Amino acid sequence: MIVRSTIVRGAMRFSGVHFLDFQRLGLRIALLAAIALATAPLNLAAAQTQAPALWTVPEVGALPNDAFGSQIRRGRDLVTATYALIGPEVPDQTKRFAGNNLACSNCHLQAGTKKFGLPIFGLFELFPQYSARRGAEITIVDRVNSCMVRSMNGRELPNDSPEMQAIVAYIRFLSSGVAQGQIVPGLGAGAMPELKRAADPVRGRAVYVKSCLACHNTDGSGIRRSLPTTDLGYMMPPLWGPDSFNDGAGMARLITAANFVHFNMPHGADYLNPQLTVEQAWDVAAYLISQPRPKKAGLEKDFPDLLQKPVDTPYGPYADGFSEQQHKYGPFAPIRAAIARAKKKQ
């Protein structure tokens, strides 16, 4: 009753109408409509992403201190402190698998458990799956190693290595209770409306200076945990430069980067409370991907079926006749239309 009376008073304030009788069905419907309008999201992008169902993420801290629990905790540590365990500066040179001092959790936020923060929660049961980039079916091990050579700019972990086994165990643990093939709402980076124009790195620089520079530095180099070395990783990760992800990483693609930024940045933002507008997110992501970063060899071999190549892949070859510039910054609707026409001719 308290909630109802509070809502009614709020609705009366918004509508400016004095209701004398709430028992009649017609007025009840009108009241509910007024409440819905008054509390509707004001941000278009937030409205575009459906609120996912409640997640029940298993608690790593509740695991027993046995071999099973230790392996999963080790996997979580490899996700959150990658640089300290398999980074390029660890004392044991045989363990230097990552080529930069990032952590997996710089992209897979909150140790892979944040909705629309590129979570790894619920992913295990989606594998094996077909990979357009490989042109073949891949396992969860293949997917982890794809991140190792692209986002971590390093080399593959051996399939039977303790590190790979621990990471896979952690991903499996996070998927506890998720059915095989179930796609959990909240995966990925979200989906906001696309621009009808190309995303603009020049406009994006202004957004970066205002909203990103304080954490990620003027030159995108981030904030290190220790000076002058990077052996303890970063408080705030580098967004470009030699210690960042390479140009074959998913975050080097505009659609992924823009949605990730919109639903997660600046710090404190989420899919319910984005802090940047849709245009700001697209433009600042364009600025980010326009900056120099490590080059991955062999990118021309990605996506053997070029008609399955994502429209925002920033490197050729292409099968649609559009330039690398448009693939990198958009607009993407004309590219999608051309690909659809080409597929119909197959």
Each language-model region and where it sits:
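Short, solvent-exposed loop/turn and secondary-structure capping segments
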Residues: 90, 115-121, 179-183, 219, ...
